[in-house]
């Protein structure tokens, strides 16, 4: 369970900061492009990746949240988890271990690999997006 206050702060402060910073960076990028200032454009790339990733990751995170939700999945999701990990409990154990193992700030993910049609648990540092980092389509994200 995550308290409403924590979620409000996360949504209105943290996520909003990523959006605001990304907008500011993209405006600076536009100005640098118009001035043909390649050095300024390159200098903005880390901030664009960080804030853009923060926005992408948190947007996915909110779609995973619901009041009074929880429990084991059903249907095709449950079948895919059981096929890949053996059981829902085995998935939870692997997901938890991977997420707790993130050093500093980052994300724990359940993702889908379209190349081999399998689910996978992965982690990303800071706000690196899962699809760009591991080539996985994000299904479930945990901000750690």
UniProtKB/Swiss-Prot annotation:
Keyword field: Manganese, Metal-binding, Mitochondrion, Oxidoreductase
Official protein name in the record: Superoxide dismutase [Mn], mitochondrial
InterPro entries, alphabetized: Fe/Mn_Superoxide_Dismutase, Mn/Fe_SOD, Mn/Fe_SOD_C, Mn/Fe_SOD_N, Mn/Fe_SOD_N_sf, SOD_C_sf
Disulphides: none
Oxidoreductase listed as a keyword: yes
GO cellular component entries: mitochondrial matrix
Job of this protein: Destroys superoxide anion radicals which are normally produced within the cells and which are toxic to biological systems.
Main location: mitochondrion
Cofactor(s) annotated in UniProt: Mn(2+)
Lineage: Eukaryota, Metazoa, Ecdysozoa, Arthropoda, Crustacea
Location within or outside the cell: Mitochondrion matrix
Catalytic reaction annotation: 2 superoxide + 2 H(+) = H2O2 + O2
Annotated positions binding Mn(2+): 10, 58, 143
Entry GO MF terms: manganese ion binding; superoxide dismutase activity
CC cofactor note: Binds 1 Mn(2+) ion per subunit.
SUPFAM superfamilies noted in UniProt: Fe,Mn superoxide dismutase (SOD), C-terminal domain (SSF54719), Fe,Mn superoxide dismutase (SOD), N-terminal domain (SSF46609)
One Pfam family hit: Sod_Fe_N
Quaternary structure (record): Homotetramer.
EC number: 1.15.1.1
Family as reported in the entry's similarity comment: Belongs to the iron/manganese superoxide dismutase family.
Ranges that cross the membrane: none
């Amino acid at each position: 369970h995550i308290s409403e206050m924590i979620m409000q702060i996360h949504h209105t402060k943290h996520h909003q900061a990523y959006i605001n910073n990304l907008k500011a960076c993209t405006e600076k990028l536009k100005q640098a492009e118009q001035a043909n200032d390649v050095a300024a454009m390159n200098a903005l790339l880390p901030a664009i990746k960080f804030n853009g990733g923060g926005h992408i990751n948190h947007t996915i995170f909110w779609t995973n949240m619901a009041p009074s939700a929880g429990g084991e999945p059903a249907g095709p999701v449950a079948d895919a988890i059981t096929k890949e990990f053996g059981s829902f409990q085995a998935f939870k154990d692997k997901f938890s271990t991977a997420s707790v193992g993130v050093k500093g700030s980052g994300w724990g993910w359940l993702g889908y690999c379209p190349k081999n049609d399998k689910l996978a648990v992965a982690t990303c540092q800071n706000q690196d997006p899962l699809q760009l980092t591991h080539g996985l389509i994000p299904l479930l994200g945990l901000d750690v």
